Swiss-Prot record:
GO molecular function, one term: ubiquitin protein ligase activity
Gene source species: Mus musculus
Reactions performed catalytically: S-ubiquitinyl-[E2 ubiquitin-conjugating enzyme]-L-cysteine + [acceptor protein]-L-lysine = [E2 ubiquitin-conjugating enzyme]-L-cysteine + N(6)-ubiquitinyl-[acceptor protein]-L-lysine
UniProt protein name: E3 ubiquitin-protein ligase TRIM9
Annotated COS domain residues: 374-432
Homology family: Belongs to the TRIM/RBCC family.
Taxonomic superkingdom: Eukaryota
Binding sites annotated in the UniProt record for Zn(2+) 1: 168, 171, 193, 198
Record keywords, A-Z: Cell projection, Coiled coil, Cytoplasm, Cytoplasmic vesicle, Cytoskeleton, Metal-binding, Phosphoprotein, Repeat, Synapse, Transferase, Ubl conjugation, Ubl conjugation pathway, Zinc, Zinc-finger
Disulfide bonds: none
PTM description: Auto-ubiquitinated.
Length: 817
């Protein structure tokens, strides 16, 4: 039960929830804490002033905000709690849990009213302190949020089991111990709060005050309040809306927004969701059991490592003492290596024990909380939180997936001392990675017919010789740096196929592979030469035959037919080839089509009448098609995207099934050169803030782009934009997006800069400088946005120009900041 306690505490005050309410994001807040973190919104910024009156804000329209940009021009505008500035006349303070609390903008309520019952200022806004989602309250104020009766029941049972002292429910800071309870108000008071909020005069003089212990008993014996509809407070929930995933009353079905929705019986859905949560808990329980057994195994490994270390050190000392004085100088070095290996193993195992212990404690707490929730007999209250709990249970179960319950370190010391060398070889005395006399694996064979390159990625495949009798524990793939430098390991594992991404375009790499087991490593395979893409399109390599030479070449041939160009970079990729070669096509340059005649040799093209924005001339020239097409194209990558991302249009169009921001990357990474791509806004509802930019391959996929240090982005709404990296917001710029808008991203790795464009106009200054490394195009969005990579070709941004000379098209100059 102790692990469950953190599930029962408010993220604002840090105490047990008191009168918890459920926010649209499924998180909970004390009603008093919710009032403390309200922020009043000016009339000009409210949604009612931007839309027709009476439209209202639904429970799930919390993305329809102006991102809290209300107090300062330097404000970032994103609803990240504690990250926006307050007005100079509005001091703010932090709660014990570190959440920034704003005082109410209205005068304090009368003393005879509790804070939970006081009127909410008009156009008040509340931000969830856990997920940082913001919502402007409607006329109902906090009464529009449903009460979490199930959570209240769980907290009551938990406190009774702990015999905890009852706390005052009206203390603004750390709650004091309650001294009385009012049976009519159903509120616990300390002495100062009782005198201030419940004076013994007027109507309150007739209220009966009892000791807290007696009040707890009477509260437990009294029937729990039935959850009522938030839209119709006098009606109880009677049905369950399948589309909105919430209980509703009969008036909602007759005249409310659920009248055309599919509904089901409340009791049936209650049983169904209880069954789903129970099934999810079964899987999580199995994971928790495995984790406990795994922790026992890890603790046993600590003892085994200690014993093996002592045994190994004794053997080492015995061998070194038998040698002459020259060996004694070497002995100290060898002992140091053993101790280092010993400490390394212990550190790895202890770190894994600590990690698994924390994860197991969190899992156990969630299980206990879910079991207590299942015991509740309130269908309506249960259904309000069941979906969120089921998702959390599945997510926690997935975190115990493959590899989590595998030891990261072995208990054996795979070292042995060879004491046979003569004294003249004493300076070469060292450990050998051998403890048995079994042979090393045979040299792997590269399967050339399965090796290929695609854009800036290379796929290699290998196998063991057919007649080999020695098993390999794994393989080590090595690649040089593309410039003839030293080899480095890019893969270590049991698989016999590996795809290496993020290579330089138009570069040559050398690859080799070797096998290993407990005895040692095999010799290297033959060296394979890889040539990455130097042309647009997707090309497959031809099968290759094995040769007797030590070096083999993996070709990247120009195909006889070229696929339509989907996505190209850099700026010189404004050529748009629709049909396959040979034949006729059209040249799309600044929306002006010009006929091209394509030579069958595919070496050049003629563009009569093309105006390349030189001073006044109109050119008819031969352009080197090899250089013109030395670009990359890409689509969105379903493999690395968040599971909520929805793909269409050959992975060129994406949207999301969640109200939360989710990240999707492009398939191709860039590490040098100048690259530009555009995205169009196909759908834009409720003024969300999608983000566009670049990211590392390991960027967080479940939050807005730029929230971590792995992404560089611009997020934009219908009025303005900001640049964001590592959750730092800069350069607020006026001008937003609507449906049909175009977002351009210019990644200049030669100058190490990142620039953004909106509707062909540069948005703000150069967004980021000193960017270097491997970057992937990236977008974050939610279900209110749909974007597409610009197809069928690219356009040059306003202010960009091209230089044209016979036989070549050069890369453009970047627009002036």
């Amino acid at each position: 039960m102790e692990e469950m306690e953190e599930e029962l505490k408010c993220p604002v005050c840090g105490s047990f929830y008191r009168e918890p309410i459920i926010l649209p994001c499924s998180h909970n807040l004390c009603q008093a804490c919710a009032r403390n973190i309200l922020v009043q919104t000016p009339e000009s910024e409210s949604p009612q002033s931007r839309r027709a009156s009476g439209s209202g804000v639904s429970d799930y329209d919390y993305l329809d905000l102006d991102k809290m940009s209300l107090y300062s021009e330097a404000d970032s505008g994103y609803g990240s709690y504690g990250g926006f500035a307050s007005a100079p006349t509005t001091p703010c303070q932090k709660s014990p849990n570190g959440v920034r609390v704003f005082p109410p903008a209205m005068p304090p309520p009368p003393t005879h009213l509790s804070p939970a019952l006081a009127p909410v200022p008009r156009n008040s806004c509340i931000t969830c302190p856990q997920c940082h989602r913001s919502l402007i309250l409607d006329d109902r104020g906090l009464r529009g949020f449903p009460k979490n009766r199930v959570l209240e029941g769980v907290i009551d049972r938990y406190q009774q089991s702990k015999a905890a002292a009852l706390k005052c429910q009206l203390c603004e800071k750390a709650p004091k111990e309650a001294t009385v309870m009012c049976e009519q108000c159903d509120v616990f008071y300390c002495d100062p709060c009782r005198l201030r909020c419940h004076p013994p005069r007027g109507p309150l003089a007739k209220h009966r005050l009892v000791p807290p212990a007696q009040g707890r008993v009477s509260r437990r014996l009294s029937p729990r309040k039935v959850s009522t509809c938030t839209d119709h407070e006098l009606e109880n929930h009677s049905m369950y809306c399948v589309q909105c995933k919430m209980p509703v009353c009969y008036q909602c079905l007759e005249e409310g927004k659920h009248s055309s929705h599919e509904v089901k019986a409340l009791g049936a859905m209650w049983k169904l969701h209880k069954s789903q949560l129970s099934q999810a808990l079964n899987g999580l329980s199995d994971r928790a059991k495995e984790a406990k057994e795994f922790l026992v195994q890890l603790r046993t490994m600590v003892q085994q490592i200690q014993e093996n270390s002592v045994e190994f050190e004794a053997c080492l000392v015995a061998q070194c003492d038998a040698l002459i004085d020259a060996l004694n100088r070497r002995k100290a070095q060898l002992l140091a290596r053993v101790n280092k290996e010993h400490e390394h193993k212990l550190k790895v195992v202890r770190d894994q024990i600590s990690h698994c212990t924390v994860k197991l404690r969190q899992t156990t707490g969630l299980m206990e909380y879910c079991l207590e929730v299942i015991k509740e007999n309130d269908p309506s209250g249960f259904l309000q939180i069941s979906d969120a709990l089921i998702r959390r249970v599945h997510l926690t179960e997935d975190q115990w997936g493959k590899g989590t319950l595998t030891p990261r370190m072995t208990t054996d010391f795979d070292l042995s001392l060879d004491n046979s060398p003569l004294l003249q070889s004493i300076h070469q005395l060292d450990f050998v990675q051998v403890k048995a006399s079994s042979p090393v694996p045979a040299t792997p064979i590269l399967q050339l017919e399965e090796c290929c390159t695609h854009n800036n990625s290379a796929t290699l495949s290998w196998k063991q010789p057919p007649l080999s009798t020695v098993a390999a524990d794994g393989y080590i793939l090595e690649l040089d740096d593309g410039s003839g430098g030293q080899f480095r390991e890019v893969y270590v594992g049991k698989e016999t196929m590996c795809t290496v991404d993020g290579l330089h375009f138009n570069s040559t790499y050398n690859a080799r592979v070797k096998a290993f087991n407990k005895t040692g490593v095999s010799p290297y395979s033959k060296t394979l030469v890889l040539q990455t893409s130097e042309a647009a399109g997707a090309h497959e390599t031809k099968p290759m035959k094995d040769t007797d030479s030590e070096e083999q070449t993996l070709p990247f041939p120009v195909p006889s037919e070229r696929l339509p160009l989907r996505r190209m970079s850099p700026f010189s990729s404004t050529l748009n080839l629709q049909p396959s070669f040979p034949g006729r096509s059209y040249f799309d340059f600044r929306s002006s089509p010009h006929q091209l005649s394509l030579h069958s040799s595919l070496q050049s093209l003629n563009a009569p009448g093309c105006n390349f924005e030189t001073q006044s001339a109109s050119y008819s020239q031969l352009v080197d098609i090899k250089k013109l097409l030395a670009v990359a194209w890409f689509a969105f990558d379903p493999g690395s995207a968040h599971s909520d991302i929805i793909f269409s249009n050959d992975n060129l169009t994406v949207t999301c099934s969640s109200y939360d921001d989710r990240v999707v990357l492009g398939k191709t990474g860039f590490s040098k050169g100048v690259h530009y791509w555009e995205l169009t806004i196909d759908r834009y509802d409720n003024h969300p803030d999608p983000a566009f930019g670049v990211a590392r391959i390991d960027v967080m996929k479940d939050m807005m782009l730029g929230k971590d240090d792995k992404a560089w982005a611009m997020y934009v709404d219908n009025n303005r934009s900001w640049f964001m990296h590592n959750n730092s917001h800069t350069n607020r710029t006026e001008g937003g997006i609507t449906k049909g808008a175009t977002i351009g991203v210019l990644l200049d790795l030669n100058r190490k800069t990142l620039t953004f464009f909106v509707n062909n106009e540069q948005q703000g200054p150069i967004a980021f400088e000193n960017v270097e490394g491997l970057f992937f195009p990236a977008v974050s969005l939610n279900r209110n946005v749909q974007v597409s990579l610009w197809a069928p070709g690219l356009r040059a941004c306003s202010g960009c120009y091209f230089k044209v000379c016979p036989g070549a098209v050069k890369s453009p100059q970047a627009p002036a900041p």
